[in-house]
Amino acid sequence: EVKETLDDIRKSIVASVEDGAPREAIELLSEARYRIFDTMVEQQRFSFLAIGRPETAGCYCKVNAYLKEVINLLANDFDYVVIDGEAGIEQINRRVMEKVTHLVLITDPSRKGTQVIDTIKRVADELVMYDRCGAIVNRVTDPALIPYIHINGTEILATIGSDPQHAANDIQGLSVFDLPEDAPVIRGAREALTKLEIL
């Protein structure tokens, strides 16, 4: 259960600076580091940090700038940092992910979905430095349709079939870690990670 988000921490530290005596940058960084690690939800073999959303409408600039620094901070303490970006090109345009090792794009098999992925890839080619890029196509209802799924210039790392058990788990508040090893999403993730040479 998430008790505090990254944006909560940012606003709290900003408020403490505005209300109190001036503080050195190193002190603020140290406090941020401590609170970020304290806020993480620890699970077996991974940790989760919720970004949160600004309460005011409009610009995400402050959150984005802070998020960039946090990503750099975390990268030194974890083997992998996975950033789950919002759907669409907004996250790319905000330049939160300026440099990554692997850019993995997720879509359903619809023509509209694959066209969006194509657009995101073209924008990312201009704004993001990455070593490898690929797509995962999920919710595939009919394996016979797989040969017709195509994304210009992007390798399809895996196709994942629709899974009633996964849907049932989601309704019950269970995670993918509660699925059996042969579940479509587990097999698809393993296939994608193998192609990316992470596994």
Locate each region found by the language model.
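Conserved catalytic-core segment of NTP-binding enzymes
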Residues: Y60-S162, A168
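Conserved active-site and cofactor/substrate-binding residues in soluble primary-metabolism enzymes
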Residues: K62, Q115, P180-R187
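C-terminal boundary of histidine-terminating zinc-finger modules
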Residues: D170-A183
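Short, small-residue-rich loop/turn micro-motifs
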Residues: R53, P164, D170
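Cytosolic-facing regulatory segments adjacent to core modules
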Residues: E27-I83
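Functionally engaged cysteine thiol sites
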Residues: E1-K11, E55, C59-C61, Q91
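C-terminal alpha-helix
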Residues: G188-L199
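N-terminal phosphate/diphosphate-binding loop that engages ATP/GTP or pyrophosphate donors
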Residues: E1-E42
